[in-house]
Amino acid sequence: MAVDVPRAVINKLMLFTAAMVVLPVLTFFIIQQFTPNTLISGGLAAAMANVVLIVYIVVAFREDTEDHKVDGNKKED
């Protein structure tokens, strides 16, 4: 029993998955070039992972509210 998932949802999920992997690692190594302290580099990498997660949640909520607005407009017609 397969569920049809919209392609936009899959694309968005893949984008944020890649960002969750790449951005913290990239942040760690870029900051490591400026300071030898791994605590700072690791902390900023963890912060970047949290930023990606928060942005994903905000995008998901906006998408959900847009769907409700579209459904509301269809019912009024």
Swiss-Prot record:
<dbReference type="GO" id="GO:0005783">
    <property type="term" value="C:endoplasmic reticulum"/>
</dbReference>
<keyword id="KW-0472">Membrane</keyword>
<comment type="function">
    <text>Functions with VOA1 in assembly of the integral membrane sector (also called V0 sector) of the V-ATPase in the endoplasmic reticulum. Escorts the assembled V0 sector in COPII vesicles. Also required for normal packaging of the SNARE BOS1 and possibly the ER to Golgi transport receptor ERV29.</text>
</comment>
<feature type="topological domain" description="Cytoplasmic">
    <location>
        <begin position="60"/>
        <end position="77"/>
    </location>
</feature>
<feature type="short sequence motif" description="Prevents secretion from ER">
    <location>
        <begin position="74"/>
        <end position="77"/>
    </location>
</feature>
<protein>
    <recommendedName>
        <fullName>Vacuolar ATPase assembly integral membrane protein VMA21</fullName>
    </recommendedName>
</protein>
<feature type="transmembrane region" description="Helical">
    <location>
        <begin position="39"/>
        <end position="59"/>
    </location>
</feature>
<keyword id="KW-0812">Transmembrane</keyword>
<dbReference type="Pfam" id="PF09446">
    <property type="entry name" value="VMA21"/>
</dbReference>
<comment type="similarity">
    <text>Belongs to the VMA21 family.</text>
</comment>
<keyword id="KW-0256">Endoplasmic reticulum</keyword>
<dbReference type="GO" id="GO:0012507">
    <property type="term" value="C:ER to Golgi transport vesicle membrane"/>
</dbReference>
<dbReference type="GO" id="GO:0033116">
    <property type="term" value="C:endoplasmic reticulum-Golgi intermediate compartment membrane"/>
</dbReference>
<keyword id="KW-1133">Transmembrane helix</keyword>
<feature type="topological domain" description="Cytoplasmic">
    <location>
        <begin position="1"/>
        <end position="13"/>
    </location>
</feature>
<dbReference type="GO" id="GO:0005789">
    <property type="term" value="C:endoplasmic reticulum membrane"/>
</dbReference>
<dbReference type="InterPro" id="IPR019013">
    <property type="entry name" value="Vma21"/>
</dbReference>
<keyword id="KW-0968">Cytoplasmic vesicle</keyword>
<feature type="topological domain" description="Lumenal">
    <location>
        <begin position="35"/>
        <end position="38"/>
    </location>
</feature>
<dbReference type="GO" id="GO:0070072">
    <property type="term" value="P:vacuolar proton-transporting V-type ATPase complex assembly"/>
</dbReference>
<feature type="transmembrane region" description="Helical">
    <location>
        <begin position="14"/>
        <end position="34"/>
    </location>
</feature>
